[in-house]
């Protein structure tokens, strides 16, 4: 039995909390894509945990966790994050997390190159996290990268890393990067990593009849194939990428949970049709505390975009939705939702593939009444004011997918579940 949790917008939807909730009954929790560019926060027993590369199933004491073959792993960050969790009380975390030997290694070299590539784009920067994710996936695609399993062989790592550095030096000239220092560090990591490295196929076979939870990173609109290219991440963040990365049997997928924030946010560059560059956007940013967990950057804010969510639903085939941060809308007199795009006076029939075209669309909004009632901490559907219920029902009707979970605050308990 497999359950997927996938971001339906631009990331930062709040996937961590629903993953934490579902992991309480899961035997295995897996990350399928991305690296330490991802970031989410979970509050449990008044303790705040920040996750980047590690699966958030680690908070559940009986849940085993896997970082799958489609990911890229920055080894220093892996150990730093693991240590931080242990210092906050998760003492056995290092015994419940494993890394696929087919995952790729994200070196410090990749971070240096990431910055150089962004600088070369000038005014058309992608707005990456600067963590080296793109260059690492590029090396993977060009068949020059290093896999986690190869770290256990000192000779392979040194040879491949020297080749990578030489290639980038030919491209960029001088690099502010210490090759010998990174080679030295990986000699130490060879021993430290060994207990964590597994053949994921053997592990997944062991759990074939168990409850498996897949934790998506980033979101559909940042997918390398289906997102707002080129303003995307470098991995497949949707349903297809998840199946590929973890070799899932599609017929065993029980549910696909799409996580949708009650409004829209985006970090970095790229088209954002419903963005509000005004006092509404500022209010959403301040009230919603919209700052990136990984970079600390301010998130751009706007109204919920149902055109985008329909497109996301079409690709990821959600069976249920988790609507998050409903309480952030409590103080609005009226709430708008994007229901259509117009371009050159005509309604756009399908979601534009061209980012420049998407930047030019005129958004058609539906205006719904606000509720002006505090919903933070609500745990029952009946606790919500009528207009908040109508807002949720409007989303359900438009997308054709039931909203099963509603987030009403930052704590694990701040969640409404509708059966």
UniProtKB/Swiss-Prot annotation:
Catalytically driven reaction(s): IMP + L-aspartate + GTP = N(6)-(1,2-dicarboxyethyl)-AMP + GDP + phosphate + 2 H(+)
Binding positions for IMP per the UniProt entry: 12-15, 37-40, 129, 143, 218, 233, 297
Binding positions (Mg(2+)): 12, 39
Co-factor remark: Binds 1 Mg(2+) ion per subunit.
SMART domains for this protein: Adenylsucc_synt
Keyword GTP-binding: yes
MF-aspect GO terms: adenylosuccinate synthase activity; GTP binding; magnesium ion binding
Its biological purpose: Plays an important role in the de novo pathway and in the salvage pathway of purine nucleotide biosynthesis. Catalyzes the first committed step in the biosynthesis of AMP from IMP.
Subunit field text: Homodimer.
Recorded family membership: Belongs to the adenylosuccinate synthetase family.
Protein name: Adenylosuccinate synthetase
């Amino acid at each position: 039995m497999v359950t997927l949790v996938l971001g339906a917008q631009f990331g930062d939807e709040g996937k961590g909390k629903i993953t934490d909730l579902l992991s309480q009954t899961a035997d295995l929790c897996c990350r399928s894509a991305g690296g330490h560019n991802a970031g989410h926060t979970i509050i449990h027993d008044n303790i705040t945990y920040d996750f980047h590369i590690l699966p958030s199933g680690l908070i559940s004491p009986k849940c085993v966790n896997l970082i799958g073959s489609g990911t890229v792993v920055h080894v220093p960050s892996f150990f730093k994050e693991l240590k931080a969790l242990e210092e906050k009380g998760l003492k056995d975390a290092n015994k419940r997390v494993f890394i696929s030997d087919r995952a790729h290694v994200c070196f410090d070299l990749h971070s240096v190159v990431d910055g150089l590539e962004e600088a070369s784009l000038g005014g058309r920067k992608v707005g990456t996290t600067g963590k080296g994710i793109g260059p690492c996936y590029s090396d993977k695609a060009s068949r020059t990268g290093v896999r986690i399993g190869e770290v256990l062989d000192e000779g392979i790592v040194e040879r491949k890393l020297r080749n990578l550095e030489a290639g980038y030096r030919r491209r960029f000239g001088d690099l502010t990067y210490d090759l010998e220092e990174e080679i030295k560090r990986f000699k130490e990591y060879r021993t430290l990593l060994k207990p964590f490295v597994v053949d994921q196929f053997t592990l997944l076979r062991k759990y074939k009849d168990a409850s498996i939870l897949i934790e998506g990173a980033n979101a559909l609109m940042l997918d390398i194939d289906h997102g707002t290219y080129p303003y995307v991440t470098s991995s497949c963040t949707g349903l297809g990428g998840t199946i590929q990365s973890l070799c899932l049997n599609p017929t065993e997928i029980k549910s696909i949970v799409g996580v949708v924030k009650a409004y829209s946010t985006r970090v970095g560059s790229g088209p954002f049709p419903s963005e509000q560059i005004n006092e509404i956007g500022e209010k959403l940013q301040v009230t919603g505390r919209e700052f990136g967990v990984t970079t600390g950057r301010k998130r751009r804010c706007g109204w919920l975009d149902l055109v985008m969510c329909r497109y996301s639903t079409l690709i990821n085939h959600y069976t249920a939705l988790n609507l998050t941060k409903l309480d952030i809308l409590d103080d609005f007199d009226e709430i708008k939702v994007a229901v259509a795009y117009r371009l050159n006076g005509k309604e756009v029939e399908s979601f534009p593939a061209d980012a420049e075209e998407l930047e030019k669309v005129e958004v058609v909004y539906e205006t719904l009444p606000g509720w002006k009632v505090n919903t933070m901490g609500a745990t029952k559907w009946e606790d919500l004011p009528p207009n908040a219920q109508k807002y949720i029902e409007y989303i359900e009707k438009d997308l054709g997918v039931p909203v099963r979970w509603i987030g009403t605050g930052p704590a694990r308990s701040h969640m409404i579940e509708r059966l």
